[in-house]
Amino acid sequence: MEKQIKVIICADDGEWSRENTDALASRGAQVVTVNRNGTALLTKIRDEKPDVVVMDLFMAGVDALGVMHVVKAEGLPKPVFIITAAYSSNALERQIMEAGADYYAIQPFSKTEIIDRIFTLAGAAQHLSNGTSRSDLRIQVT
């Protein structure tokens, strides 16, 4: 049996509804919520050691790029980072992904798809933590 995944959702009230939190929990996730503030989010990441963090690119205190930088600089276990934003550009997307994001979602997006993506990415991360390195993974395109 796979371990329960821990997900931190960093969003203002109303952005991530109770229904979506319940949907995650019904699929076996432990959900922790924090208001959209990067400084508060960093405290939760340090305390909770989540498997997945869903956060907006722009937050009070510290933005998503800053959060990912601090996690790396402090040597904290790296969660799967899912970044949400209201707009996109190729340069911005490249910067976010290079900073350590695992997925970048442009709003509006389907919460069902994000929930599915959380479990897909968390499963891949668990597989990697069980001894398979990224260099062991191969993609074959036919």
Question: Which positions does each model-derived feature cover?
Answer:
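Alpha4 helix (beta4-alpha4-beta5 surface) of REC/receiver domains from two-component response regulators
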Residues: 66, 87-103
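Two-component/phosphorelay signaling modules centered on CheY-like receiver
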Residues: 14-33
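Active-site residues of response regulator receiver
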Residues: 55-57, 85
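CheY-like receiver
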Residues: 124-142
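Acidic, metal-coordinating helix/loop segments flanking the phosphotransfer/catalytic sites
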Residues: 34-52
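C-terminal output helix
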Residues: 91, 109-118
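Short amphipathic alpha-helix used as the core "switch/output" element in two-component signaling
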Residues: 65-76
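Acidic catalytic/metal-coordinating carboxylates
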Residues: 37, 63-66
